[in-house]
From Swiss-Prot:
The keyword Hydrolase does not apply. It catalyses: 4-imidazolone-5-propanoate = trans-urocanate + H2O. Pfam families: Urocanase, Urocanase_C, Urocanase_N. The keyword Lyase applies. This is Urocanate hydratase. GO terms for cellular component: cytoplasm. Catalyzes the conversion of urocanate to 4-imidazolone-5-propionate. Signal peptide: none annotated. Keywords: Cytoplasm, Histidine metabolism, Lyase, NAD. The gene is hutU. GO terms for molecular function: urocanate hydratase activity. Binds 1 NAD(+) per subunit. InterPro entries: Urocanase (IPR055351), Urocanase-like (IPR023637), Urocanase_C (IPR035401), Urocanase_central_sf (IPR038364), Urocanase_CS (IPR023636), Urocanase_N (IPR035400), Urocanase_Rossmann-like (IPR035085), Urocanase_sf (IPR036190). Pathway: Amino-acid degradation; L-histidine degradation into L-glutamate; N-formimidoyl-L-glutamate from L-histidine: step 2/3.
Length: 555
């Protein structure tokens, strides 16, 4: 089993020429490769895409076999992938998914990092995160709009909708956390982001998600103070350990206007640098004594959360951004760790009740112009949404593409299928240079059960019920998605989440149009169903408005 190969540089084919037997297999091939593009993946030599050790394939041998199999796969066959390893090809039918993926799933009693890491070391499992192992990661852009929407809502709730002259304090500039600086600036606030790995700060500078790198805390705070005084939002990255820097800021009596965190706290071995440790010691100890790393990291996270609680008590709006750091701190003895809320119940759930979530698409042509053309089509089809238009304008100006050109755009039930059909028609008419794929994050309205994140504090207490993502995956399979995935542990770590993903290809055919209409209606509708079942009035109203047939819910 080979997991480290620095000589591998993966880039997807681009343009209209096929390297597989059809676009339904070419698309997953290109998106798998795109996940490992050097401008996309956090550590491509080890197949790590983002989120600690979220991989695209179990090992390089498995990657090669997946590629070989996709190149020969027929239009009536389906490839099964088990934790990043291709395990079977079966005869199905033309409207069935071409790939079905299951990653990191464990029987609940054994769903712990300890058991998973043992399997991982034996080469029997792979952590798929959310979009790493499901081949629809589009770089940091994938989370930018969700982060932007969260910050805008924080500004609306706490500062009258105006974040000018305000600043956000956070930590973590990995694949997900790296969206925070740009999202904050787009929302009108400055941002100070602490990151322990200099390479991540360098990557965010290179890809345009970060404006400045500060060498000291004094320098960072000086830049922030000046930007707030001038009401010119900027983002600053500071090399440091959050559990050490946050208390230092507290000691100075400096208070941010908003506080959150996106360190990889979900993985206490691979994701969080213990207090006082060097990166070199951390890397060595992960190999030699992972139990000691975990113990030290958990204690450090407890101190981190205690500092966040102190900021909250000083009046700073504080929110958990879904990395499970509160749970780790509570387990370590911080009894009031959950005194500040998660971002979904605090700011995002009303969108989920409407089936609105992180709709995304990528241009298989590799041509940015295809994305700009689809941006214009979105505006044409949804003309009366100035907030959405503003987002698309900002994205076009500020977001640099990583790997295949792509776009993230939060839309919901009633709009997703219309956009998909329009994109498919654009391919059919030759307005786009090649097909596009449409997918989403697993963080969506009906596709995840995560009691410390997406389903925290559900109205009916159904936070931990994971039937919903299973039903979502089954429904998308039956509806004809091109590939469907079912994962465990994404975002918050082993034992704390189950979630499903789907991707569908717009290749310009009538058959694709039929699949698109089914999938892109049913997928967000399942989210409205899930929230209606939990008793949310918004979801119940949307379900009636859209004519959803929910016999056990609407009566």
């Amino acid at each position: 089993m080979t997991r480290h190969d620095p000589n591998r540089v993966i880039r997807p084919p681009v343009g209209p020429e096929l390297t597989c037997r059809s676009w339904l297999t070419e698309a997953p091939l290109r998106m798998l490769m795109n996940n490992l593009h050097p401008d996309v993946a956090e550590n491509p030599a080890e197949l790590v895409v983002y989120g600690g050790v979220g991989r695209a394939a179990r090992d390089w041998e498995s990657y090669d076999r997946i590629v070989e199999t996709l190149r020969r796969l027929g239009d009536d066959e389906t490839l099964l992938v088990q934790s990043g390893k291709p395990v079977g090809v079966f005869r199905t039918h033309a409207d069935a998914p071409r790939v079905l993926i299951a990653n990191s799933n464990l029987v609940p009693k054994w769903a712990t990092w300890e058991h998973f890491n043992e399997l991982d070391r034996k080469g029997l499992a792979m952590y798929g995160q959310m979009t790493a192992g499901s081949w629809i990661y589009i770089g940091t852009q994938g989370i930018v709009q969700g982060t932007y929407e969260t910050f805008v809502e924080m500004g609306r709730q706490h500062y009258g909708g105006d974040l000018s002259g305000r600043w956000l304090l956070t930590a973590g500039l990995g694949g997900m956390g790296g969206a925070q600086p740009l999202a904050a600036v787009m929302a009108g606030a400055s941002c100070l982001a602490i990151e322990c790995q200099p390479s991540r700060i360098e990557m965010r500078l290179r890809t345009g998600y970060l404006d400045h790198a500060a060498q000291t805390l004094d320098e960072a705070l000086e830049i922030i103070e000046r930007s707030c005084r001038e009401k010119r939002p900027v983002s600053v990255g500071l090399v440091g350990n959050a559990c050490e820097v946050l208390p230092q800021i507290l000691e100075r009596g400096v208070l941010p206007d908003l506080l959150t965190d996106q360190t990889s706290a979900h993985d206490p071995v691979n994701g969080y640098l213990p207090k006082g440790w060097s990166l070199e010691r951390w890397a060595a100890m992960r190999e030699q004594a992972p139990d000691q790393v975990e113990e030290a990291a958990r204690a450090s996270m407890a101190e981190h959360v205690q500092a966040m609680l102190a900021f909250r008590k000083a009046g700073v709006p504080t929110v958990d951004y879904g990395n499970n750091i509160r749970q780790v701190a509570k387990d370590a003895g911080v009894t009031d760790a959950f005194d500040f809320p998660g971002f979904v119940p605090a700011y995002i759930r009303p969108l989920f009740c409407r089936g609105i979530g992180p709709f995304r698409w990528a241009a298989l042509s590799g041509d940015p112009d295809d994305i700009f053309r689809t941006d214009a089509k979105v505006k044409e089809l949804i003309p009366d949404n100035p907030h959405l238009h503003n987002w698309l304008d900002m994205a076009g100006e500020r977001i640099r593409f990583q790997g295949l050109p792509a776009r993230i755009c939060w839309v919901g039930l009633g709009d997703r299928h219309r956009l998909g059909l329009a994109f498919n028609e654009m391919v059919a008419k030759g307005e786009l240079k090649a097909p596009v794929v449409i997918g989403r994050d697993h963080l969506d309205s009906g596709s995840v059960a995560s009691p410390n994140r997406e389903t925290e504090a559900m109205r009916d207490g159904s936070d931990a019920v994971s039937d919903w993502p299973l039903l979502n995956a089954l429904l998308n399979t039956a509806s004809g998605a091109t590939w469907v995935s079912l994962h465990h542990g994404g975002g918050v770590g082993m034992g704390y989440s189950q979630h499903a993903g789907m991707v569908i290809v717009c290749d310009g055919t009538e058959a694709a149009a039929r699949r698109i209409e089914r999938v892109l209606w049913n997928d967000p509708a399942s989210g409205v169903m899930r929230h209606a079942d939990a008793g949310y009035d918004i979801a119940l109203s949307v379900a009636r408005e859209k004519g959803l047939d929910l016999p056990g819910i609407l009566g």
